[in-house]
Amino acid sequence: MTAPTDPQLHLDQVMSRLTGPGGRFELVEEPVLGTRMPVMKNRGRSVGELLTTSLRWGDRDYLVTADRRMSYTEHAAAVAALATALREDYGVRKGDRVAILAANTPEWVVAFWATQVLGAISVGLNGWWVPREVEYGLTHSRPTVVVADAKRAETLAAVGTDLPVLTMEEDLPALFARYAGSPMPHTDVDEDDPAAILYTSGTSGRPKGALHSQRNILAVVDYHRFSDAVVGEFSGRPVDPAVPSPLRYLLTSPLFHIASLHNLVIPRLATGGAVVMHQGGFDVDAVLRLVERERVTNWGAVPTMASRLVEHDDLDKYDLSSLTSFSLASAPSSVAFKERLREKVPFARNALVDSYGLTECSTAIAVATAPELEQFPGTLGRPIITVSMEIRDPYGEWLPDGVEGEVCVRSPFVMLGYWEDEAATAAAIAPGRWLRTGDYGLVENGRLRLTGRRSDLILRGGENVYPTEIEQCLDEHPEVLECAVIGTPHEDLGQEVAAVVVLRPGAAATEAELREYAADRLSYFKVPTRWRITTDLLPRNATGKMVRRDITV
């Protein structure tokens, strides 16, 4: 059969074949927590089962660092040993929590899978938390045991917890040896049983624990399998699910977030691909050396990392020809930034992808392909498979295309709720399992365009001002590296618009110049009236999101 000359038509036909009756990813409508929605017919029911089936990938690389390699066989043996130790020595049972507090390391991944085969709940604590925040996380999640690296074990000592703490450097190797050869534990779970707790970034308050189910995580795995299959069919190289994937994914974001855990480490175990893990702070040259050595094919980066690539003065000294997919995620980026990225970074020119998602949704809500970013700049693509998306007004009513409102979504990816927080769950999940994202946007040509966070909205004299619009405008100025726009109190207007602008090295733009630049491109009430020009980078959290509450003018 000859493929259509229209790429979009070809893509639609490929997706229809894969998801139609009898297709590998056939879609059916079934009840999920009391609400009917599209789901994949041929799906798994237990996250732990993925570990058992991964044994077929044998001695292939699963986890790779700068100085270590762990095959699928070695990984499964370590998981079986640790799971047995957790069950026999620490009494971990189905539904118990096992907290993981560490930087990115293979042992983090082993601890996650050991928890899963026991039917317990993996709690990914933020490795950047200070003692006060760690204490909150422990009190909130009430784990049976904590697995930590040496540095975070010191933090736990400062907290004074009486929980058992297993260190990755000493305790885990001893347990691997003691329980070597143990059979893999198996625990029966239901599809909607909880599997993991990951904490929200907490950019506007205390972190909440998003509770993800077996269904949520397995749906993410199937989404990535589906995406791989679509690419294979579209390019004329169909994917055989019985053959291990040749793809090698670079992991640069923390494992305690969905980008690295749900959307990389877990699905790649299911497909037989390799996870190449950068450890330590983000160093461009160290990362690029790893890409070159390991022939990395796919990399999902936060915009702050991509910005370091743009500023690098000698990318050509590295052989980066293996990279065929480069995606942005976890934080917004402007059209101007994407243009600079494509111009400066060779592997981003034809492979750049952007997406929109949040912890509560387990994965992306919408994805924009490279052609879409070119044809529809400023948008974030269309909803991914099984995601229903609506724009709603403050009363929860549907709004038509082109009208701005709150982005609301429903899918098998949406979390069960917030761990032990019924009020927050009720506020976030509307009847019919519709998640209120808290983000404002609109739909253009079937594609999502975000306008800002509801919590970031500036109310100036009766006018709604979205910081994102102003930030993206200022970001286009050639001397601006990054910027933040916030609202500050004003006696008459309620709030006024203020901007903190970080200049590029050697730049000398003045407040007057930037004010004039903004005034030429924005309505008068959107032009900042207060400015702070600096060379100090803006505060960001572990996923690269700007922490507005820490910004002052």
From Swiss-Prot:
Highest rank taxon of the organism: Bacteria
Induction (free text): Up-regulated on cholate.
GO BP: fatty acid metabolic process; steroid metabolic process
InterPro entries: AMP-bd_C (IPR025110), AMP-bd_C_sf (IPR045851), AMP-binding_CS (IPR020845), AMP-dep_synth/lig_dom (IPR000873), ANL_N_sf (IPR042099)
EC annotation from Swiss-Prot or TrEMBL: 6.2.1.-
A GO term, aspect molecular function: cholate-CoA ligase activity
Keywords per UniProt: ATP-binding, Ligase, Lipid metabolism, Nucleotide-binding, Steroid metabolism
Pathway entry: Steroid metabolism
Record has NAD as a keyword: no
Catalysed reactions listed for this entry: cholate + ATP + CoA = choloyl-CoA + AMP + diphosphate; deoxycholate + ATP + CoA = deoxycholoyl-CoA + AMP + diphosphate; chenodeoxycholate + ATP + CoA = chenodeoxycholoyl-CoA + AMP + diphosphate
Function noted in UniProt: Involved in cholate catabolism. Catalyzes the transformation of cholate to cholyl-CoA, thus initiating degradation of the C5 cholate side chain. Can also catalyze the ATP-dependent formation of CoA thioesters of deoxycholate and chenodeoxycholate.
Family as reported in the entry's similarity comment: Belongs to the ATP-dependent AMP-binding enzyme family.
UniProt-recorded name of the protein: Steroid-24-oyl-CoA synthetase
Provenance organism: Rhodococcus jostii (strain RHA1)
